Amino acid sequence: RERGSGATRKFSFSTPAIIEVNGSTQVISPGTDVVHALDLKDGSVIWQASYDGYSVIPRPVFGHGMVYMSTGYGTPNVLAIALDGKGDVTNTHLRWRLQKGAPHTPSLLLVKDELYMVSDRGIATCVDARTGAIHWQQRVGAAYSASPIYASGRVYLLSEEGVGTVLAASTEFKSLAVNDLQERSLASYGVAGDSLVIRTAKHLFWVEEE
């Protein structure tokens, strides 16, 4: 069938990922209805894959010979696409797809063999990055815009309500801490050495261990 979301607003906001594949530098750029892998030297298309989606926001991540991305609005899907293709790889290089728990806004987080994500509606998910098999899914709040980050064996989440949740980076769900900043936040954590920088609506917090 003909693919495409039918979106009339052909824009996206995803920051491209720049990766090395077999000695060449590829720019992975998701957009409305299609992701392109471009040659950094001349901008030529190395490969492309189509999907239904527009206004793509999450930044793609790279590992295990695949790029992982979310397709944006309307119904987001997380796609794992092998990087060794040429031309249109839509029907040949898609290794797995996940719809339940896929984010519209927060970017994905790859830690070793696991891919972590949190949906805009507050569902956190951990999957096997190689196969897409779900290790766990758990509600961790109501709404999210900020992307998860990893530090010191932990995954850090921050909801729009300003509630920070700390999870173990594990194939088993383990909530280690919950901290309510009592102020709205849409920004992802910043990391500076062993410290976290947190932006809320009215404050900038610097958090470090005593």
Question: What kind of feature is each model-predicted range?
Answer:
Residues 1-24, 30, 48-63, 70-76, ...:
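Extracytoplasmic beta-rich repeat domains
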Residues 30-32, 72-74, 83, 120, ...:
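Short loop/turn segments immediately following the C-termini of beta-strands
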Residues 34-40:
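Membrane-embedded hairpin module used as a gating/binding unit in multi-pass transport
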Residues 76, 162-163, 169, 183-210:
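Blade-level signature of beta-propeller repeat domains, shared across WD40, Kelch, NHL, RCC1
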Residues 76-78, 98-169:
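Loop/turn-rich, solvent-exposed surfaces of beta-rich toroidal or solenoidal domains
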Residues 80-89, 129-130, 166-172, 208-210:
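Short loop/turn segments immediately following beta-strands, especially the blade-tip
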